């Protein structure tokens, strides 16, 4: 493994962990997700700036490894899409854009604090950008998640999301990556679609790498990489985390090689499609995650040898 995180097994949920610490959110909004009625956090009051939230976790990671380290934060656009609702939030933040502006400010402060701990890579997680790739959702309003029933406009929302990312990433002295998965929950994906709709918008993104999913149908396609802007690398998600099936080394290598046939192999890294960390869903076992990562590293070694200069 060339890059590691702390695994995030400490967390409650990759959004809620942040939101519960900044305050202003209540578990009050009921919605239906895959025929299951849930109650989610929604912003109802002003968030508060305080001490950095995740410095202790980052320092622990840096202290216990000599490897390149990564720490992930949720993106402002993702949080705003899911956690602002006019029926609950308007008194605190009149519009979703007001909420998103404050989120961006708080996350920029957090990212700068993390960079000072010695973390090498800061990743912003933004499945909401991938929502814009699902034509069924954006054109027909088809979704299993009530929170996504809204007006979608890629020409307005993609630049909005990237502007927020740039405010966070712009002056960081570390590598910045963007992760766009298909919103995996309980081993199911909320949306489907290749990445062709959003990749051209990354031309203006102040990121070093974008991490995408390619391991199962309904996600990325290798020819998506023809639209990857110059100067940005790609993390090809080549391991499916949604089920217990263990992909072979050869199968993983095949996906990576398809990408290397389109762009310079030096621009490609391999990674799992999405995270193995638990949340309110059904996490994989440690043994499953370990075996999948072992096959991933073997495939990466074979590809390095295959495409060596």
Task: Map each language-model feature to its residues.
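Domain-level signal for soluble alpha/beta catalytic cores
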Residues: 1-309
């Amino acid at each position: 493994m060339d890059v590691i995180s702390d695994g995030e097994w400490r967390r409650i949920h990759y959004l809620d962990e942040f939101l519960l610490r900044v305050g202003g959110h209540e578990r009050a909004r009921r919605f239906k997700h895959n025929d299951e009625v849930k109650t989610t956090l929604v912003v109802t009051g002003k968030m508060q700036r305080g001490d950095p939230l995740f410095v202790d976790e980052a320092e622990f990671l840096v202290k216990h490894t000599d490897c390149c380290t990564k720490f992930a934060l949720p993106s402002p656009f993702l949080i705003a899409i899911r956690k602002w609702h006019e029926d609950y939030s308007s008194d605190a933040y009149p519009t979703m854009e007001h909420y998103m502006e404050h989120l961006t400010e708080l996350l920029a402060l957090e990212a700068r604090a993390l960079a000072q701990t010695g973390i090498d890579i800061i990743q912003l997680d933004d499945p909401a950008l991938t929502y814009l790739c699902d034509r069924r959702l954006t054109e027909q309003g088809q979704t299993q998640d009530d929170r996504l029933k809204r007006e979608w406009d890629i020409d307005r929302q993609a630049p909005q999301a990237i502007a927020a990312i740039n405010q966070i990433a712009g002056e960081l002295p570390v590598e910045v990556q963007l992760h766009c998965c298909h919103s995996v929950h309980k081993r199911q994906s909320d949306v489907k679609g290749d990445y062709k709709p959003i990749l051209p918008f990354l031309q203006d993104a102040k990121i070093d790498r974008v991490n995408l999913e390619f391991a199962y149908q309904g996600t990325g396609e290798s020819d998506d990489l023809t639209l990857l802007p110059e100067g940005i690398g790609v993390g090809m998600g080549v391991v499916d985390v949604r089920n217990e099936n263990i992909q072979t080394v050869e199968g993983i290598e095949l996906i990576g090689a398809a990408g290397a046939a389109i762009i310079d192999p030096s621009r490609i890294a391999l990674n799992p499609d999405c995270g193995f960390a638990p949340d309110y869903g059904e996490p994989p076992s440690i043994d499953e995650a370990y075996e999948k990562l072992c096959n991933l590293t073997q495939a990466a070694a074979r590809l390095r040898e295959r495409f060596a200069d």
